[in-house]
Swiss-Prot record:
<dbReference type="Pfam" id="PF01113">
    <property type="entry name" value="DapB_N"/>
</dbReference>
<keyword id="KW-0560">Oxidoreductase</keyword>
<feature type="binding site">
    <location>
        <begin position="169"/>
        <end position="170"/>
    </location>
    <ligand>
        <name>(S)-2,3,4,5-tetrahydrodipicolinate</name>
    </ligand>
</feature>
<feature type="binding site">
    <location>
        <begin position="12"/>
        <end position="17"/>
    </location>
    <ligand>
        <name>NAD(+)</name>
    </ligand>
</feature>
<dbReference type="InterPro" id="IPR022664">
    <property type="entry name" value="DapB_N_CS"/>
</dbReference>
<keyword id="KW-0520">NAD</keyword>
<feature type="binding site">
    <location>
        <begin position="126"/>
        <end position="129"/>
    </location>
    <ligand>
        <name>NAD(+)</name>
    </ligand>
</feature>
<dbReference type="GO" id="GO:0016726">
    <property type="term" value="F:oxidoreductase activity, acting on CH or CH2 groups, NAD or NADP as acceptor"/>
</dbReference>
<keyword id="KW-0963">Cytoplasm</keyword>
<keyword id="KW-0028">Amino-acid biosynthesis</keyword>
<feature type="binding site">
    <location>
        <begin position="102"/>
        <end position="104"/>
    </location>
    <ligand>
        <name>NAD(+)</name>
    </ligand>
</feature>
<feature type="active site" description="Proton donor">
    <location>
        <position position="163"/>
    </location>
</feature>
<feature type="active site" description="Proton donor/acceptor">
    <location>
        <position position="159"/>
    </location>
</feature>
<dbReference type="GO" id="GO:0051287">
    <property type="term" value="F:NAD binding"/>
</dbReference>
<feature type="binding site">
    <location>
        <position position="160"/>
    </location>
    <ligand>
        <name>(S)-2,3,4,5-tetrahydrodipicolinate</name>
    </ligand>
</feature>
<dbReference type="InterPro" id="IPR036291">
    <property type="entry name" value="NAD(P)-bd_dom_sf"/>
</dbReference>
<dbReference type="InterPro" id="IPR000846">
    <property type="entry name" value="DapB_N"/>
</dbReference>
Length: 273
């Protein structure tokens, strides 16, 4: 990677998240907007990326071909869909480009492809790039170690009507953090739906509930409920800019790293807290 400004490419540049990623890239010192990508046939192709994001003219035009921009970026930032992200991943691996991946909804094969690619390129892969959410994940680990063995644990998440995967990647990351702290595998203790005559709650399980409504940016709560008291740890996002800023910060953090798989806790140095 270059010693000067880190040049980033933004996938899905015309989407809500893409536009805010462009704004964040233009605002952070040490980062340069190098390229912007949209799907083939999109009406926004050829538009100035800065103007598209409401940040003024930049001279960076929205392209549809990775080959056309391969010399214009060092790190590729992707918050699109799993199938598109995996195509971008293969290209970045082939050409030695770093990646910041905020896409959610991967199956196990997709996650394994990311792990495999990290042998050759540096990747930050996180379910949520908010600083607050990642601090919350650390708090959940601590709470689970103290309270998890004798409380009922439930995770409730809410997002806008357009979100296509459930539970959210962040909710799953919360469950993983709690399960790991309890020396469990989430797939063995997660309960993703309850309907009809379910019987009493099974001890030691982690329940999930999902809301999809309106324009909710993202709300996540973990509940540790006992008889007579409960602890709730909640994060609420009011703007996607918190995710965009974290993603661009992660791209800058990748400077000088040739390979490896990282998450936001690495970026924020939270692992040792």
């Amino acid at each position: 990677m270059h010693d000067a400004n880190i040049r980033v490419a933004i996938a899905g540049a015309g989407g809500r998240m893409g536009r805010q990623l462009i704004q964040a890239a233009l605002a952070l010192e040490g980062v340069q907007l190098g390229a912007a990508l949209e799907r083939e046939g999109a009406s926004l192709l050829g538009s100035d990326a800065g103007e598209l994001a409401g940040a003024g003219k930049t001279g960076v035009t929205v392209q549809s071909s990775l080959d056309a921009i391969k010399d214009d970026f060092d790190v590729f930032i992707d918050f699109t869909r799993p199938e598109g992200t995996l195509n971008h991943l293969a290209f970045c691996r082939q050409h030695g480009k770093g990646m910041v991946i905020g896409t959610t909804g991967f199956d196990e094969a997709g996650k394994q492809a990311i792990r495999d690619a990290a042998a050759d390129i540096a990747i930050v892969f996180a379910a949520n790039f908010s600083v607050g959410v990642n601090v919350m994940l650390k708090l959940l680990e601590k709470a689970a170690k103290v309270m998890g063995d004798y409380t009922d644990i439930e995770i409730i998440e809410a997002h806008h009507r357009h979100k296509v995967d459930a539970p959210s990647g962040t909710a799953l990351a919360m469950g993983e953090a709690i399960a790991h702290a309890l020396d469990k595998d989430l797939k063995d203790c997660a309960v993703y739906s309850r309907e009809g005559h379910t019987g009493e709650r099974v001890p030691g399980t982690i329940g999930f509930a999902t809301v999809r409504a309106g324009d909710i940016v993202g709300e996540h709560t973990a509940m540790f409920a006992d008889i007579g008291e409960r602890l709730e740890i909640t994060h609420k996002a009011s703007s996607r800019m918190t995710f965009a800023n974290g993603a661009v910060r992660s791209a800058l953090w990748l400077s000088g790293k040739e390979s490896g798989l990282f998450d936001m806790r690495d970026v924020l140095d939270l692992h040792n807290l």
